[in-house]
């Protein structure tokens, strides 16, 4: 009987902790780089340094709202991937997770075309995160 109580307690604690730890924590994501959007319509290039390869990326907009018109990811092998985001991001919003075709890919650069929303709120920061 004592072993059954101990076993049930262990199962209960394990179940409790499994709900407390998110499966997609920031620990799984690596910071790739960021850009500060100028006022109005702006095109920026984020050059990616290092030898890391990623399966997925996502972006997070902070400091001010931003309308992302277009985003292109250029890989080391010369291929290009157009990412259709066309979205208004509020301060603190994240994009969906963007999967790369073919698994692990080395990123050479990411080009953004965006427009600042609400100039009085300041310049938006666009941060790119990658997952292996």
Regions found by a protein language model. Name each.
Residues 1-24:
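Bacterial Sec-dependent N-terminal signal peptides
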Residues 20-47:
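Transition segment at domain starts
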Residues 33-35, 82-90:
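Solvent-exposed serine/threonine-rich low-complexity stretches and specific carbohydrate-binding patches
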Residues 38-68:
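Short, surface-exposed binding/anchoring microloops in extracellular/periplasmic proteins
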Residues 39-41, 90-95:
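Solvent-exposed, conformationally flexible loop/turn segments
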Residues 44-49, 94-102:
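Exposed aromatic-hydrophobic patches
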Residues 53-59, 102-118:
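Noncatalytic modules at the cell exterior or secretory-pathway interfaces
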Residues 63-85, 121-131:
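Short, surface-exposed beta-strand/strand-loop-strand elements in extracellular ectodomains
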């Amino acid at each position: 009987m004592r072993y059954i109580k101990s076993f049930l307690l262990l199962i209960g604690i394990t179940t409790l902790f499994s709900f407390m730890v998110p499966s997609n924590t920031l620990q799984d994501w690596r910071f790739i780089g960021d850009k500060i959007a100028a006022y109005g319509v702006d095109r920026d290039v984020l050059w990616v340094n290092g030898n890391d390869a990623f399966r997925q990326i996502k972006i997070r907009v902070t400091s001010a709202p931003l309308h992302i018109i277009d985003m292109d990811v250029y890989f080391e092998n010369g291929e290009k991937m157009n990412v259709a985001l066309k979205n208004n991001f509020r301060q603190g919003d994240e994009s969906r997770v963007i999967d790369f075709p073919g698994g692990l890919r080395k990123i050479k650069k990411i080009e953004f075309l965006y427009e600042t929303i609400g100039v009085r709120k300041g310049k938006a920061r666009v941060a790119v995160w990658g997952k292996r």
